[in-house]
Amino acid sequence: MKAFNKLFSLVVASVLVFSLAGCGDKEESKKFSANLNGTEIAITYVYKGDKVLKQSSETKIQFASIGATTKEDAAKTLEPLSAKYKNIAGVEEKLTYTDTYAQENVTIDMEKVDFKALQGISGINVSAEDAKKGITMAQMELVMKAAGFKEVK
């Protein structure tokens, strides 16, 4: 559970790293993946110039990695975390279960997200000024690689 909470905070924290954003003509995307403590994570960034427009994450959480053996056990741990995303502007979250793992998909529209509400999930503080500047793809690449993610080409 502690490992999952750290992992969960890492994913959210990656969203909240800010610096000045540039402009460009066409949208591009970059995908990063990692297997952290038995949890498979794939994060895709859509960006224009150097400004991140959207982040989508697909997380496959093995029940064993959170100390659960059944869907019901996993739900007791994961549903309260999932519920925190509900009603946050610019965030879509879906959590589904199989017999051995949970699949969480989260999409964050960086141009619509309520950063103040989002930071409440992980407890990270971001100033209003930083939120207005935007998130750069260059910074996200550094954050992802430092966290053990590899770019998927």
From Swiss-Prot:
Name of the molecule in the record: Uncharacterized lipoprotein YehR
Species in which this protein is naturally found: Escherichia coli (strain K12)
Keyword annotations from UniProtKB, A to Z: Cell membrane, Lipoprotein, Membrane, Palmitate, Signal
Lineage: Bacteria, Pseudomonadati, Pseudomonadota, Gammaproteobacteria, Enterobacterales
Family classification: To L.monocytogenes lmo0207.
Subcellular location: Cell membrane
Gene: yehR
Tagged with keyword Membrane: yes
N-palmitoyl cysteine lipid sites: 23
Keyword Cell membrane attached: yes
